[in-house]
Amino acid sequence: MALTAEQKATIVNEYGRGENDTGSPEVQVALLSANIDGLQDHFKSNKQDHHSRRGLIRMVNQRRKLLDYLKRKDFERYQSLIQRLGLRR
């Protein structure tokens, strides 16, 4: 479910614009996507966990807001990110 420090560091290195870049929209979206993927696996075996489902919906909404911001500010970075994460088909 939750990401380990090593997993977070790997995501930051892969999607960050610099060495210690944890605040850029790309990194935030990538971290949220990893958390969302983990929760989706959790819900396959725990269908009645509505409390965690609320957290999942909150993460999805936050990711959507960050993607909208990135699309508005720098469309090329947005396209690159969704292609790398495989979010749109």
UniProtKB/Swiss-Prot annotation:
Family to which the UniProt record says this protein belongs: Belongs to the universal ribosomal protein uS15 family.
Q: Fetch the NCBIfam families from UniProt.
A: S15_bact
* Single GO cellular component term: cytosolic small ribosomal subunit
Q: Which SMART domains match?
A: Ribosomal_S15 (SM01387)
* GO terms classed as biological process: translation
Keyword terms: Ribonucleoprotein, Ribosomal protein, RNA-binding, rRNA-binding
Q: What does this protein do, in the record's words?
A: One of the primary rRNA binding proteins, it binds directly to 16S rRNA where it helps nucleate assembly of the platform of the 30S subunit by binding and bridging several RNA helices of the 16S rRNA. Forms an intersubunit bridge (bridge B4) with the 23S rRNA of the 50S subunit in the ribosome.
- The protein in question is named Small ribosomal subunit protein uS15
Subunit structure, as described in the record:
Part of the 30S ribosomal subunit. Forms a bridge to the 50S subunit in the 70S ribosome, contacting the 23S rRNA.
Keyword rRNA-binding assigned to the entry: answer is yes
Q: Which InterPro entries match?
A: Ribosomal_uS15, Ribosomal_uS15_bac-type, uS15_NS1_RNA-bd_sf
Q: What one GO molecular function would you report for this record?
A: structural constituent of ribosome
